[in-house]
Curated annotation (Swiss-Prot):
Residue ranges of the region described as Interaction with substrate tRNA: 48-51, 172-176, 260-265, 293-300
Keyword check for Transmembrane helix: no
Annotated function: Catalyzes the transfer of a dimethylallyl group onto the adenine at position 37 in tRNAs that read codons beginning with uridine, leading to the formation of N6-(dimethylallyl)adenosine (i(6)A).
Name of the featured protein: tRNA dimethylallyltransferase
One Gene Ontology term of the molecular function aspect: ATP binding
Subunit structure: Monomer.
EC numbers: 2.5.1.75
Site (Interaction with substrate tRNA): T114, R136
Annotated GO biological process: tRNA modification
Residues noted as binding substrate in the record, renumbered to the chain: T25, A26, S27, G28, K29, T30
Cofactor(s) demanded: Mg(2+)
Length: 331
């Protein structure tokens, strides 16, 4: 079998400057971004793997029409839910947009919580086998016959490093790891470790053109309360009807990346009858809390970040002070 690889992408060019505003879900990123926009001529680049999809507005907490009109936004509503959007595509799009925004005399403000996108932009992407639809289809058939735990056991034989950090039912990541091995003959962990070594060598003595501001809670209970409030608001705004309309299209399945987004997966299962509708709220809140936990873990692996406690009453002022120190355009 011939092996084709996605092109390697380096981190953002050193002659570009931008500010990144990251944080877990419900940490107040949108409010902070709009506050920055009141003082600096910015254009916002969304760093959110769910906001790229059209027709997924309520469950993704997509910015309102008024918010989108107040400040130029990019990488929102650029894909149909039927089509996936990768970290490699994000890096190419973000680099292009950062350069274009800079050429317009404005500052690119990257805002979101998809940490894989941030990491890919900061550290670059090494060569990785391209997605292979045929191999993925075979894996889906095998999973239907044997179950994902069986495929997880197979992965443990060929890539124990990756298997050790994946749950036996993590279908998306197990499928990708086995796909990489079957296409290339090398485990996914091989490519990831090589990439890490390459980035250490490339970045030694270098400086980042980005300022990374990270909104992180000092009190998890505060964040959990906001998550519950937001999910309740989504349900009250017609989230279930939104998912029902997506299902009614007939061409979407629960295995698509778009439908695996937190909240959408739980709502789909409830509409399918595989999970009681009465449990949707609790399951959705729990899944969102787990997502926030993973996001915070990612953020803590980024030593260059400037942390602002999002549960501090002066959080917005602190964010603005960091931005003011970074740009002469602050007004």
């Amino acid at each position: 079998m011939s092996v084709s690889f996605a092109p390697a992408h380096s981190a953002s060019p050193p002659n570009t400057s931008y500010i990144a505003l990251a944080g877990p879900t419900a940490s107040g990123k949108t409010a902070a971004a709009l506050a920055i926009a009141e003082h600096v001529p910015v254009e916002i680049i969304s760093v959110d793997s769910a906001l790229v999809y059209r027709g997924m507005d309520i469950g993704t907490a997509k910015p309102s029409a008024e918010e989108l009109a107040a400040v130029p936004h990019h990488l929102i509503d650029i894909r149909d839910p039927l089509h996936a959007y990768s970290a490699a595509e994000f890096v190419l799009d973000a680099q292009r947009l950062i350069a274009q925004i800079s050429a317009r005399g404005r500052l690119a403000l990257l805002v979101g919580g998809t940490m894989l996108y941030f990491k890919a932009l900061f550290d670059g992407l090494d060569e990785m086998p391209k997605a292979d639809a045929a191999v993925r289809a075979v894996l889906a058939i095998e999973a239907a016959e044997k179950g994902w735990p069986a495929l997880h056991a197979e992965l443990a034989q060929v890539d124990p490093v990756t298997a050790a950090r994946l749950a036996p039912n993590d279908s998306q990541r197990i499928s990708r790891a086995l796909e990489v091995f079957r296409v290339s003959g090398q485990p996914l962990s091989f490519f990831q470790q090589r990439n890490a070594s390459k980035n250490i060598a490339d970045n030694a003595g270098g400086t980042s053109a980005a300022t990374l501001i990270s909104l992180e809670p000092t009190d998890r209970a505060w964040l959990h309360g906001r998550i519950a409030q937001r999910f309740d608001a989504m349900l009250a705004s017609g989230f279930v009807d939104e998912v029902r309309a997506l299902r009614a299209r007939g061409d979407l399945t629960p295995d698509l990346p778009a439908m695996r987004c937190v909240g959408y997966r739980q709502a789909w299962e409830a509409l399918d009858g595989t999970s009681p509708m009465s449990e949707l709220r609790d399951k959705g809140v729990f899944a969102t809390r787990q997502l926030a936990k993973r996001q915070i873990t990612w953020l803590r692996s980024m030593p260059q970040r400037r942390v602002v406690a999002c549960d501090d009453p002066t959080a917005l002022e602190q964010v603005l002070d960091l931005v003011k120190a970074r740009t002469d355009a602050f007004q």
